[in-house]
Amino acid sequence: MPQKVRIALDAMGGDFGASVVIPGAAIALGRRPDTEFLLFGDSAKIAPQLDQHPRLKAVSRVIHTDVAVSNDDKPSQALRRGRKTSSMWLAIEAVKKGEADVAVSAGNTGALVAMARFCLRTLDGIDRPALAAIWPTTRGESVVLDLGATIGGDAHHLVALSVMGSALASVLFGKPKPTVGLLNIGVEEMKGHEEIREAAEQLRAMNLPQLDYIGFVEGDGIGKGAADVVVTEGFSGNIALKAAEGTARQVTEFLRGAIQASLMARIGYLFARGAFAALRARLDPRRSNGSVVLGLKGIVVKSHGGTDAEGFASAVRVGYEMARCDLLTKINQTLNRDGGASASEPVAQEAVS
């Protein structure tokens, strides 16, 4: 019998804290029974939720702390106030100590990235982490990064993101040489700012064995599945993510309004109910919730702060799968195949939320 995956949860993170984290963990456990949980947070708030889920309670250990990182805390403030004591820090530290295989938090993005970087440290050759997520496309799925861990970055940073993203895609999709594209305002070589053009030149010149660089990808190419990995710096990546989530919700509302507009539309819906249900599920952002903080000596997953239990369960699933497939080892192996791809670059600004 395989060893259980141990997941550390920041039970106080996100907009709703334990009232979403605990039910979400219970849903995840039902789908992945070979899981154990460390729950960090206020035991007085965790216990009532845990009592409603006996199966989860049986495989969980609560570690009390009444210190939680606020959504309004800047990364520097969170580090000063919550280092060593907050539920977010303690969940990350459990990974560092080997008590957990992965940490999951729905808390403040900037604080999470800062704490994870400070506690776990970056991998050799990686100057700063990135947020990567699995993005549903018309061709299947793609990996997109950086979705907001840091803002800005030079060509070296974009090349490092390409290497890490290709390693993640290789693990997830079983492709030894995934395709990689740089997000840009056009596919022509002269388009974009100097940093992205320089990164493109470096990727072409390096001809890395672990990835197939295909050139620039426009914004609509993400959803089309133009590349297995789409790379951008965190500011543009976060805008793309929020725009896609908003569009999915908008399309769902448009469909609901069209169906309710007339009797004939409602009758037609009855005949196509299965197709509409499949479309709604496909557009549901909760299914894609959970971004991996890549580039660290440990696995950390960021959940959306405003998600519900089902969405948080998706983030836990991402963490489970990253631990099960031994992502960290495979990223290290990929990075070691090219020591020069991840040269240091100037320090970036704080993460976006």
Curated annotation (Swiss-Prot):
Protein name: Phosphate acyltransferase
Xref: HAMAP family: PlsX
GO BP terms: fatty acid biosynthetic process; phospholipid biosynthetic process
Quaternary structure and partners: Homodimer. Probably interacts with PlsY.
InterPro entries given in the database record: FA_synthesis, Phospholipid_synth_PlsX-like
Subcellular location field: Cytoplasm
Signal sequence bounds: none
Gene Ontology molecular functions: phosphate:acyl-[acyl carrier protein] acyltransferase activity
Species per Swiss-Prot/TrEMBL record: Bradyrhizobium sp. (strain ORS 278)
Keywords assigned by UniProt, alphabetized: Cytoplasm, Lipid biosynthesis, Lipid metabolism, Phospholipid biosynthesis, Phospholipid metabolism, Transferase
Family label: Belongs to the PlsX family.
